Curated annotation (Swiss-Prot):
This is Bifunctional uridylyltransferase/uridylyl-removing enzyme. Coiled coil: none annotated. InterPro entries: ACT-like_dom_sf, ACT_dom, HD/PDEase_dom, HD_domain, NT_sf, PII_UdlTrfase/GS_AdlTrfase, Polymerase_NTP_transf_dom, UTase/UR. Residues 700-782, 809-887 form the ACT domain. The gene is glnD. It catalyses: [protein-PII]-L-tyrosine + UTP = [protein-PII]-uridylyl-L-tyrosine + diphosphate; [protein-PII]-uridylyl-L-tyrosine + H2O = [protein-PII]-L-tyrosine + UMP + H(+). Modifies, by uridylylation and deuridylylation, the PII regulatory proteins (GlnB and homologs), in response to the nitrogen status of the cell that GlnD senses through the glutamine level. Under low glutamine levels, catalyzes the conversion of the PII proteins and UTP to PII-UMP and PPi, while under higher glutamine levels, GlnD hydrolyzes PII-UMP to PII and UMP (deuridylylation). Thus, controls uridylylation state and activity of the PII proteins, and plays an important role in the regulation of nitrogen assimilation and metabolism. Uridylyltransferase (UTase) activity is inhibited by glutamine, while glutamine activates uridylyl-removing (UR) activity. It comes from Acinetobacter baumannii (strain ATCC 17978 / DSM 105126 / CIP 53.77 / LMG 1025 / NCDC KC755 / 5377). Pfam families: ACT, GlnD_UR_UTase, HD, NTP_transf_2. Keywords: Hydrolase, Magnesium, Multifunctional enzyme, Nucleotidyltransferase, Repeat, Transferase.
Amino acid sequence: MINTSPLLNYVSSHHDIKAINQWRTDVEKQLQDSYENGQSIREIIKARSDLVDEALVFLWKHAELDQSKLGLFAVGGYGRREMLPYSDVDIMILSEDEISEENEKRISTFISSLWDVGNFKPGISVRTIQSCVEQAATDLTVATTLIEARLITGNTQLAKWPRRIVSQTWTDKTFYDAKMAEQAKRYHQHNNTESNLEPDIKNAPGGIRDINQIGWIAKRHFRVNRIYDLVHLGFISEFELAVLEEAESFLWEIRHHLHRLAKRDENRLLFDHQREIAAKFGYVRQEGQPVNYGVEQFMKRYYRTAQQVSTLNEMLLAYFSESVITPRLPNYERKIEVVNDHFKIVDNKLAVQHHKIFAEHPSAILELFYILANRPDIEGIRARTLRLLILAAKRINQSYRDNPEHQALFMSIIRSPYRLYDTLVAMKRYGVLGNYIPAFGQIMGLMQYDLFHIYTVDAHTLLLLRNLNRFREPEFAKEFPVVSSVFQRLARQDIVFIAALFHDIAKGRGGDHSELGAEDAIEFGRAHGFTERECKLIAWLIQNHLLMSLTAQKKDISDPDVVKDFAEKLGDMEHLDYLYTLTVADINATNPKLWNTWRASLMRQLYTHARDVIRTGLGRPVDYQMLIEDTKFAASELLVNNFALADVEKVWQELGDEYFIKESADEIAWHTQAILKHGDNPEPLVLLRAHRKAAQDAVQIFIYTRDQPNLFATTVAVLDRMNLDVQDAKIITASTAFSLDTYVVLDRFGTLLTDPEREETVKNALVKALSQPDQYPGLMQRRIPRQLRHFDIENTVDVTLNEALQQNMVEISTLDHPGLLARVGGLFMMQGLDIHSARIATLGERAEDIFFVTKKDGKPLNHEEVKLFSEKLKAALDEASNQICQH
């Protein structure tokens, strides 16, 4: 029992309707105290609804409506007695006939008093029975509210009408079809997934609306008031009801906290609130745990809960369709195809032959999915079979996993060429995959608290497997031409599938997830028929699944030594081919924004160069002189018809060997032609063209200008202002004191090379700024994205010496923000450092950038200079991060 102050104590002493405002404030505090003292959220939200009833009855009488024949109904969540702190108070005033003028005045008084109270958010409709019929017939929302309309006060004869109206205007089938179409639209608005980074706990798949949906459809047909009543009708089991109620209470509690934190009706579990709400549920990081452990465990519970809700929603509504809707269709004839002794296909869905199949033949659990994987014509699983399957999955134990028949069935599913992804998603959803591979069960719902990994670990893993499967489908060969060709010639494609399944399986355990996952995979591989050699290859792929992407992202892959070092770590073409396919599939399954033709070109370039090194022999040293001569010859062939070789040589002799080692013949010819045409023009030269290997996304910007301080900082500031994201930069300073800079940028709008006016704007902005870089304002003030303010990223600076280049490599990891590159470039200038090249990577909210620098005399920093510079750069990054968090 929750003790709250009686309303009459307030209105009788104050003689003022507005006193209800103070009463609501006081009882809301009392409700919160009760909640904090252990009262269940169910009791709290019901008590709040009853208190609102009390206030409305008082106001109804105050407006003298108790003397009318009208009825006051609660609708929506209020009708279900589900009131959160800032929920709308949705009501309907219903009349049997046309409303008299006198009652209209009373209604007006009642509505005015509702607004006068001040802390109600009323949603009011006034209808006659006839208008209800007319609106319900054409408006699904109206029909839905009528199903749960609850008479608060007034004419009790009207209480039966709302549901009667729905029965008159909608059949079981039309209402079911309309609500399912509405749900599909709602799902689409939330990416058809339970695991969005900032989920809407009311409307997203697996949210409160999914539970409401079960109630609406069942109440419409069975004429019950509570989902609990459906147990006695055999529509839902006691166990399923308990799962739903526990999930509903958890979602209500989250929503309760969201309302109080946001001080409004808020359903989105934003980054702004996740950590604080996690703490309210007791998910707090303990000493020695990762910094985001608490919030990640809380979100894991949320995602698992949402998965349970959406699965029950799917099963129960399918059961309703199969048992109530379909059999009543005119001319309906059940179509049955016998598959074998265990299964049949009923109306295109798979069903067991009898309800004891899984108990008597445990292998049928996996056999069901084997059939699904190899029969694209089957549309799903019958609801009764699904109910049996979910219960049977809980009986999968070590003895089941050790059974050779079951192991063979599982591998047959993995090797299925048809519906691997859909089958594995179903196995996960219905509890089979997490029980068959317990380590996979541990990562289900596990999220990483950042903007880079937009999927939970389990969802990411299955998307990776989907991508691998696509590499053998002709329709994706155009999108992934090289990797598709490589994948199709792999001797054992199931090796890379198992590596994919286990590559992140040890996340969340602590320790090196790659090493732990490799150990799990070896144990699994031995049990499932792989040889020791194959197990070692699977383990190597898991241990090195980030090697290729990190090499392409953080190292200069135009440097032959970098490629040679990478190739030596692989050893042979087999390891290269397997790793390449795994890497491309992995990147595409991490974040859709991460993959573009620029990144694809980097992967392809690294693959082809490593392949060439392996084929010519890993032991052979790089012949730089021959490489330079070959590149010059190829470039001169492209120029010979338009320019005198003497003029070409004059340009080239100022550039140094590194330029000809790292640039392609095509790019050298492009640069040389532009410089010769530019002649003695004192203005900076700026050219744009599509990147030769990544034309769809990436643009190359070539700048030729007199070398002077602040060039890099000025250039990147202009590019940021023009909505261009720098991916790569190469800066060559010629002996003539001219700088040749090549930037690869991604266009946020995708119009740079198709809109001549915009292209000209970018060129002019660069020319103007580079003509007087010391006067350019530099940093641009742009709005900091809301999400960035909630990530606590430790800024790191690592400065090392590249012995071969005699340059310092500066690696920074920091919170990405507008103007970051310009800020860093400005600091380099102030410290008297020249930037020779840069690799820029934005991974969600994190920037991981690499710069190769020297002092003005071309020499690297010494030990003391490195220490001093590192401290200054770290301080600058810390200051920028603090400004973002306080923004």
